[in-house]
């Protein structure tokens, strides 16, 4: 397995860990996986830092109920990993049920041999083209 193939496999496993941590509201795992400079750009237009995103899960402002990913492609360019996928999410946000159907770009950055999630850009798929 080449370095790039090994990196792709590692990033895919990290995405699985991140999804499991989101569903379990596993703050310790998310703290480990997320870069301190994380920018999370939601499909709703909101933007979170690592601190705000983790706080939302810790305080149960956001509760993930289901996350389903498919159509995933991972590209690695040096110490940057790009994950492109389709994600369907069922969550509760501030007591309101949400069903999201989004395209997602996740940017992973390797620092000192450790991959951490640096950025997410989520875009809603318009209902008329689903």
Ranges and model annotations:
Residues 1-33, 37-130:
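A beta-strand edge to alpha-helix "cap/lid" segment located at domain peripheries
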């Amino acid at each position: 397995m080449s370095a790039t193939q090994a990196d792709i496999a590692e990033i895919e496993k990290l995405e699985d860990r991140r999804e499991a941590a989101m569903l379990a509201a596993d703050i310790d795992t998310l703290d480990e996986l997320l870069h301190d400079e994380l920018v999370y750009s939601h499909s709703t237009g909101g933007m979170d830092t690592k601190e705000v995103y983790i706080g939302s899960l810790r305080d149960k402002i956001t509760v993930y109920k289901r996350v389903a990913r498919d159509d995933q492609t991972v590209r690695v360019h040096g110490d940057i990993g790009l994950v492109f996928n389709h994600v369907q999410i069922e969550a509760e946000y501030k007591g309101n049920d949400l069903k999201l159907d989004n395209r997602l770009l996740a940017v992973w950055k390797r620092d000192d041999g450790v991959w951490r999630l640096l950025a997410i850009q989520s875009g809603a798929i318009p209902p008329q083209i689903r």
